[in-house]
């Protein structure tokens, strides 16, 4: 996300606030310290990016770091990038039986079929095996 600042005066304070605001938005939250609960006492289930993957933790409701996401999918989208870098074969919590394809990087570097539940999965979920191969396998070599 890119912020824009509208300066209506040449005040040094406004300019400083603008620069600080833009810098905070451009810094990737995935690099912040993971899983910081904070000093408050709520038990909010959130996700944090740690050791190359998104994991759940309980957030206290205040302070902490920006490495905190409301959902697993949001964490993966922000921290892992495109669909080929996301966890393969996430079924989700629903019970539909939808045939899909997912990219598995290691150890096979290939697209395989899986059954998607119909909700909450992630973007490593393709309706067409050819799209999966073209996007994930052939581009990576």
From Swiss-Prot:
GO terms for molecular function: serine-type endopeptidase inhibitor activity. Its main location: secreted. Keywords: Disulfide bond, Protease inhibitor, Repeat, Secreted, Serine protease inhibitor, Signal. It is found in: Secreted. It holds the Pfam family Kunitz_BPTI. Residues 1-23 form the signal peptide. One of its GO terms (cellular component) is extracellular space. Residues 30-79, 84-136 form the BPTI/Kunitz inhibitor domain. Prismatic layer of shell (at protein level). InterPro entries: Kunitz_BPTI, Kunitz_BPTI_sf, Prtase_inh_Kunz-CS, TFPI/VKTCI-like. Disulfide bonds join 30-79, 40-62, 54-75, 84-136, 94-119, 111-132. It comes from the Eukaryota. Coiled coil: none annotated. This is BPTI/Kunitz domain-containing protein 2. PROSITE patterns: BPTI_KUNITZ_1, BPTI_KUNITZ_2.
């Amino acid at each position: 996300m890119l912020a824009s600042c509208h300066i209506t005066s040449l005040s040094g304070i406004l300019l400083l606030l603008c620069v600080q605001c833009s810098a905070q938005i451009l810094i990737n939250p995935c690099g912040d310290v993971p899983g910081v609960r904070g000093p408050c006492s709520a038990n909010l289930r959130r996700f944090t990016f740690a050791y190359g993957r998104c994991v759940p933790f309980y957030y206290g409701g205040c302070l902490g770091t920006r490495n905190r996401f409301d959902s697993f999918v949001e964490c993966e989208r922000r921290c892992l990038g495109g669909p080929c870098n996301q966890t393969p074969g996430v079924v989700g919590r629903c019970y539909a039986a939808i045939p899909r394809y997912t990219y598995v990087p290691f150890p096979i570097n290939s697209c395989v079929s899986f059954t998607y539940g119909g909700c909450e999965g992630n973007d490593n979920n393709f309706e067409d095996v050819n799209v999966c191969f073209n996007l994930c396998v052939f581009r990576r070599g």
